[in-house]
A protein has these predicted regions:
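Cyclophilin-like peptidyl-prolyl cis-trans isomerases
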Residues: 17-323
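Positively charged n-region of N-terminal signal peptides that target proteins for export
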Residues: 1-4
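Bacterial N-terminal signal peptides
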Residues: 6-15
Length: 323
């Protein structure tokens, strides 16, 4: 019995030492922090738009920085958005809707009133419905043989409920199942994405009414409404606003709601001392490891890996570039 007990103690010590010797898996945030400088891509200032809301109740500024989508996606709407910002059209307008777990929307509170509506700048285009998607852009193959990676050729989900999904140049995309020239890509409605409000089809929206997703990703909107970008800084100013008490979360002044004024919306070229930003390249090995860690948490808090992740649960890391 003494020998049996001795063997048991030795086995226990061996198991304990083995557990201590095993490397601790990194959490996603640790993988991002350890990513080499070469793995980050600078965001062009020309792709940034800045919205300043009125200060909060304590007088603190509320700035929201939006990164606009690159070609070939949504360029008709983005062209309109650039013209609206250049004309300072949103200045003095407001956040008009905050629908819990859905969207925060801003624009002209009198936009539905033909008499009171603010005149739009000249040169805005009407964008066709087929522009909700674009010819497929593809993605470079990345594999990490040391991990059970579900990230190859940019693809993230082979069992996504809505579409094949992938990342491309820092953006989450859906992809059609077509082969060859018929294949299409489109941006998807993840948290923080910015879209174009519209009326019933065939209306596609001008870009004067914008919204951002503040809740669970409403992927049913993909290819039904245009997306023009995403919020990369200041998202807390949009998600924490009081919810509207009117229909669909619109602010109802008769019910005591107060709209949040917009002080200014500017393209980055007009904003003094705007920080520079960069994103973790979705073509990098660091992002591959990060995506795998989001899908399969192995860091000490977790008991078992989930075995997968929705594309919107793998947000692309964005940070300020240190001066």
């Amino acid at each position: 019995m003494k020998h049996v007990a001795g063997f048991a103690v030795i086995a226990l010590l061996a198991a304990t030492l083995g557990a201590e010797d095993r490397p601790v898996a990194l959490a996603p945030v640790e993988i991002v922090a350890a990513a080499p400088a070469a793995g980050w891509v600078a965001i062009a200032p020309s792709d940034l738009m800045v919205m300043d809301l009125a200060p909060d109740a304590k007088g603190k500024p509320r700035r929201v920085v939006i990164q606009l989508l690159p070609p070939p996606f949504s360029q008709g709407w983005i062209g309109n958005v650039r013209k609206l910002a250049a004309a300072h059209w949103w200045d003095g307008l407001a956040v008009v809707r905050v629908h819990d777990n859905y969207v925060t929307q801003w624009g002209d509170p009198d936009g539905e009133d033909k008499v009171k509506a603010k005149a739009l700048p000249e040169g805005l285009v009407t964008v066709p419905q087929n522009a909700y998607s674009a010819p497929a852009v593809g993605a470079r193959l990345i594999r990490d043989p040391s991990r059970g990676l579900l990230y190859g050729k940019g693809l993230i989900a082979d069992q996504d409920a809505y579409a094949i999904t992938q990342f491309w140049r820092g953006w989450p995309l859906g992809r059609s199942a077509d082969i060859g020239p018929a294949q299409r890509n489109w941006p998807v409605h993840c948290y923080g994405m910015v879209g174009v409000g519209r009326d019933y089809p065939p209306n596609t929206g001008s870009g004067a009414e914008l919204y951002t997703v503040i809740g669970h990703a409403p992927r049913q909107l993909d290819r039904n409404i245009a997306l023009v970008g995403r919020i990369i800084e200041g998202m807390e100013h949009m998600s924490s606003l009081p919810r509207g008490h009117g229909e669909l979360g619109f602010y109802d002044l008769a019910k005591g709601d107060e709209r949040v004024p917009i002080v200014a919306v500017r393209l980055a070229a007009e904003v003094k001392d705007l920080p520079a930003y960069e994103y973790l390249s979705t073509e990098s090995r660091s992002f591959a490891a990060y995506a795998d860690a989001r899908a399969n948490r192995r860091d000490p808090f977790y008991l078992r890996p989930a075995g997968g992740a929705d594309i919107c649960n793998i947000p692309v890391p964005v940070r300020r570039i240190k001066p």
